[in-house]
């Protein structure tokens, strides 16, 4: 769960030397949340019970954000591949994959991440 966005790509902060981040844009899950960049992912995770203890959630959200930035409509296999290396002992991953797939569909339909800051009707 040590994932951050480094110049738009998800990287493990715990495996990245500070010199490698020199001059780069670094975004944490908190920064992505405050900017509403992942609001739709957070809502979808909540709606689909894609989190339980929450330990893996920051890494899953950063990974999903990076994936959907690179590829608007990834297949379920591509989602699973992107998530490899992020371990969840609680959910079995299907709800996480479902949530990411749902966000990809919503974004393809023209909804934005910020749309999900509003409470559901």
Give the ranges of each region predicted by the language model:
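Signature of N-terminal electron-transfer/Fe-S-associated modules in redox systems
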Residues: 1-121
């Amino acid at each position: 769960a040590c994932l951050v966005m480094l110049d738009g790509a998800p990287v493990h902060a715990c495996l990245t030397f500070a010199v490698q981040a020199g001059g780069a844009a670094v975004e944490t899950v908190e920064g992505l949340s405050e900017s509403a960049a992942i609001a739709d992912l957070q809502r979808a995770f909540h709606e689909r019970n894609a989190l339980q203890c929450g330990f893996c959630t920051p890494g899953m959200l950063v990974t999903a954000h990076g994936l959907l930035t690179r590829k608007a409509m990834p297949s379920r296999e591509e989602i699973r591949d992107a998530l490899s290396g992020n371990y969840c002992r609680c959910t079995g991953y299907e709800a996480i994959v479902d949530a990411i797939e749902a966000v990809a569909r919503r974004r393809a339909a023209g909804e934005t991440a910020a749309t999900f800051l509003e409470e559901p009707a």
